[in-house]
Amino acid sequence: EQCGRQAGGALCPGGLCCSQFGWCGSTADYCTVPGCQSQCSGSGPAPGPGGLTNLISRETFNQMLLHRNDGACPARGFYTYDAFIAAARSFPAFATTGDQATRKREIAAFLAQTSHETTGGAGWAAPDGPYAWGYCYNRELNPPSSYCASDPNYPCAPGKQYFGRGPMQLSWNYNYGQCGRAIGVDLLNNPDLLSSDPTISFKSAFWFWMTPQSPKPSCHNVIIGAWSPSSSDRAAGRATGYGVITNIINGGLECGKGWNAQVEDRIGFYKRYCDILGVSYGNNLDCYNQSPFGNGVSVDSM
């Protein structure tokens, strides 16, 4: 096997599709979803990020992440449009699958979920409202531990800590190891790259977004409509929509417990970004009545 869950989440080179069996190719056998695991499209590798720059310009990016470079934000100056676009080149299916509304909705959903993970504004005056303060942080504040777990495949490097870093706040040595293997960077020995190199930092978030972790689908497949809930998903209240993405990311802490401020914050960012991009929200935005997925990579276990 060359890619996907059979190869630690590795991506195929050159934008090739990863089949359900973990092999790289460009024909329908490899690229047809839902069997395809990553870099999927209906007829071979998806186009590169030229389409992405047409959907979200530098000006729009700056409007969406309005206060990321504010003096109150510890990560000011770190997250750039150029790094976002450069990182997307390693994940050519991102925001290139489906019609224009679907592609815009994926951009909104990705930036919304990562904005929640990196949000500022709490505890100080937040001009323009709380949903204009995404991407304020690039590393976890006051981590409670080194996030080092015993793992024969991805052992902790001496003296290194694996607390939350980057847009998706990737945590734990086994997640750094899988991600690093997929993007071709030794993150086990160099975890600080996620808070010092903005392109690698964005790549870590795209890796999480595009990679399914059984029994969870990828966030990408959910937002483009390639995931169909099984009978057990339906019994658990999980239906296609933005709410399932929240479940994938942090369902253990936020889903199936009724209304809570964390889920509302994720929805608030999403609605603001959809409005800026001029696209509808879709259905099933929350996960209040969804049971969490089983074990798998998620921010709450990261």
Curated annotation (Swiss-Prot):
GO MF terms, alphabetically ordered: chitin binding; chitinase activity; endochitinase activity
Signal peptide (residue range): none
Gene3D superfamilies according to UniProt: 1.10.530.10, Endochitinase, domain 2, Endochitinase-like
This protein's UniProt keywords: Carbohydrate metabolism, Chitin degradation, Chitin-binding, Disulfide bond, Glycosidase, Hydrolase, Plant defense, Polysaccharide degradation
Propeptide: 296-302
Catalytic residues in the record: 117 (proton donor)
Disulfide bond positions: 3-18, 12-24, 17-31, 36-40, 73-136, 148-156, 255-287
Domain Chitin-binding type-1: 1-42
EC number of this enzyme: 3.2.1.14
Reactions accelerated catalytically: Random endo-hydrolysis of N-acetyl-beta-D-glucosaminide (1->4)-beta-linkages in chitin and chitodextrins
Keyword Glycoprotein: no
Pfam families (alphabetical): Chitin_bind_1 (PF00187), Glyco_hydro_19 (PF00182)
Key word Nucleotidyltransferase present: no
Gene Ontology annotations of biological process type: cell wall macromolecule catabolic process; chitin catabolic process; defense response to fungus; polysaccharide catabolic process
Function recorded in the entry: Defense against chitin-containing fungal pathogens.
Family, similarity comment: Belongs to the glycosyl hydrolase 19 family. Chitinase class I subfamily.
Name of this protein: Endochitinase 2
Protein source organism: Gossypium hirsutum
